[in-house]
Regions:
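Extended, composition-driven regions rather than compact fold-specific motifs
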Residues: 2-212
Length: 212
């Protein structure tokens, strides 16, 4: 499902991690005076034996991990802690609503691929424009793309307007929503009010926060 890992990278792309490097080591070695490591949560798109796929969103003014992803080469090392998950639908769930920006779409897709054949879903995927969406074999044809166009990530209103106009039966519905923290908070309040959802029918996670 939406398994996510905490990835830790070193300022030196050629850095080799010691055996049994842990989250404790990360916290101990990073001080106010010296912080050679950076870390952030990323969701796992897919898992194979001895391999995992993680999607990075490359953008202007990237953070340390996005910079690392652009420069990484074969055998570049990264430390990982986890996985964890926030996708926990209650028993009896029959339909799903996935709402995600670029950072959360891998988690949504991984969750969709684990649904049973008789379970229905709707996806609202936000991205910049037609050129930044990806192709996906969607047997139910239930992925709806919402484009920000010239609006910066974390500032668009089209996704919220689409959510406000949703008409869904809340019975046996589970909502997974993740993306920019402030937008997710607004969407959560909107859905809770409009659909009268119980707490166990919702998973809302801020994957990142817009600053400035």
């Amino acid at each position: 499902n939406d398994a996510f890992m905490y990835l830790i990278i070193h300022n030196d792309l050629n850095h080799k991690y010691p055996n049994k490097f842990s989250m404790h080591d990360f916290r101990e070695l990073n001080t106010k005076e010296n912080n050679p490591y950076s870390g952030a949560y990323y969701t796992i798109r897919s898992i194979r034996e001895n391999e995992i796929d993680i999607w990075f969103v490359l953008h202007h003014n990237p953070g340390p991990l996005a910079v690392w992803a652009e420069k990484a080469v074969e055998k570049s090392e990264v430390a990982m802690w986890g996985p964890r998950t926030s996708f926990s639908p209650p028993n009896g769930t029959k339909s799903y609503l996935f709402i995600a920006d670029e950072t959360a779409q891998p988690a949504a897709l991984a969750s969709i691929e684990n649904l049973r054949d008789n379970e229905k879903y709707i996806c609202l995927f936000e991205t910049q424009n037609e050129s930044t969406k990806f192709k996906y074999d969607d047997p139910q044809n239930r992925i709806e793309w919402i484009f920000r166009e010239d609006i910066a990530a974390g500032e668009g209103t089209k996704l919220l307007k689409r959510v406000e106009n949703l008409s869904m039966d809340p019975k046996n519905l589970y909502v997974f929503c993740a993306g920019e923290a402030k937008q997710i908070s607004i969407i959560r309040k909107t859905l809770k009010k409009n659909l009268s959802l119980n707490a166990d029918q919702m998973s809302f996670t801020g994957y990142w926060r817009k600053t400035g």
